[in-house]
Each structure stands twice: as structure tokens, then as C-alpha cells.
From Swiss-Prot:
Interacts with RAF1, PPP3R1 and PPP3CA. It comes from Bos taurus. CDD domains: RRM_RCAN1 (cd12708). The gene is RCAN1. One of its GO terms (molecular function) is protein phosphatase inhibitor activity. This is Calcipressin-1.
Length: 197
């Protein structure tokens, strides 16, 4: 975005630490801090446990650069530690930038469309009249061959299904022929009272 500018803070390092003991054990944390205190006495640490990162703030950029040169990709407690210069974000304005007006008129149409805008005509639907004619000639139970088979292609045949009314009538006749099921009542279990009064 045009209003954001990333600059590097050369007096701060970000340490990517794979060992999570640094965030929980004070002895491990003291060992870690002693590595960097040799380069600068006025150093501060910020621990970000969920990101597995530590921000190390030096008093001057030279000691930060020296620490990065000496300690980058070194092992700490058996795992590799990587160091990077911290990035600071400078926002040019405290307000959000408005969106680019490329297709803004589609979201909220203005009183008149943009210059050069033309309405797109809808394409006419593709209707296969041969297929409609062939289907109209068919009756129930008949079949119609749309395309004859060749040596390389199969034939296309349409089979017309029987109407739903005939199926419904057959189902109704079967229901009438079946005897009505007799419902047998379930006997109530014997009741014996626990407390007699």
C-alpha cells in the first residue's frame, strides 16, 4: 500500500528460537540473555512465546550488528538460532486510504455510469430445435435414435419414461388388495406397590 513504509530498526534483533524452554525456565532464559549481554550491557528482551520469537533491543546499532554477525545460525541448547533485524512499520497517515475507484460504481452505482461504459447485451439462448421436435414426436415406451452409430462413435438413443399417473394407479390398486394389518394391543405389566399404607 502506498501509505505504509517498512524500515529496519538496526538497533533491534528478532531471534527465532526453536527451543521453548527459554519461555518457561529462568535458568535457560539467563543463559540466553548472557549470550547477548557480552555485546551490550544496556540491553532489553521481549519474549513472544506464541510466536517462538524474542525481540532484543540494543542501545546502539553497532552492537546489534556485531551480535548478529557472531550469533546468527549458531546452536543454542542443541537447536539452531536465527537472528534478523527488526522491521518497524511507519504509517503515513492515521486514516485509512480510500479504495481504488476501478469498479466502485458496481458497489454503489452513481447517478451516471463512468465514461465509456456500455451495457452488455444478453446472448440469446441456444435452443436445439431438432431435439425438441424429436422429443415431441415420442410417445410413452417408444425410443428414438438421435444420432446413428458410426465406426468411431456410439449411437444416441432417447427412451421416454412412462407417465407418473399410470404408476400411481398401479400403486393404489396394490394397496387396496392388501389386507389391513391387525394391531395387537400390548398387555400392561403387573404393578406391585413397594410401600403399602
Amino acid at each position: 500500500m502506498h501509505f505504509r513504509n517498512f524500515n529496519y530498526s538496526f538497533s533491534s534483533l528478532i531471534a527465532c528460537v526453536a527451543n521453548s524452554e527459554i519461555f518457561s525456565e529462568s535458568e535457560t532464559r539467563a543463559k540466553f540473555e548472557s549470550l547477548f549481554r557480552t555485546y551490550d550491557k544496556d540491553i532489553t528482551f521481549q519474549y513472544f512465546k506464541s510466536f517462538k520469537r524474542v525481540r532484543i533491543n540494543f542501545s546502539n546499532p553497532l552492537s546489534a550488528a556485531d551480535a548478529r554477525l557472531q550469533l546468527h545460525k549458531t546452536e543454542f541448547l542443541g537447536k539452531e538460532m536465527k537472528l534478523y533485524f527488526a522491521q518497524t512499520l511507519h504509517i503515513g497517515s492515521s486514516h485509512l486510504a480510500p479504495p481504488n475507484p476501478d469498479k466502485q460504481f458496481l458497489i454503489s452505482p452513481p447517478a451516471s455510469p463512468p465514461v465509456g461504459w456500455k451495457q452488455v447485451e444478453d446472448a440469446t439462448p441456444v435452443i436445439n430445435y431438432d431435439l425438441l421436435y424429436a422429443i415431441s414426436k415420442l410417445g410413452p415406451g417408444e425410443k428414438y435414435e438421435l444420432h446413428a452409430a458410426t465406426d468411431t462413435t456410439p449411437s444416441v438413443v432417447v427412451h421416454v419414461c412412462e407417465s407418473d399417473q399410470e404408476n400411481e394407479e398401479e400403486d393404489e390398486m396394490e394397496r387396496m388388495k392388501r389386507p389391513k394389518p391387525k394391531i395387537i394391543q400390548t398387555r400392561r405389566p403387573e404393578y406391585t406397590p413397594i410401600h403399602l399404607s
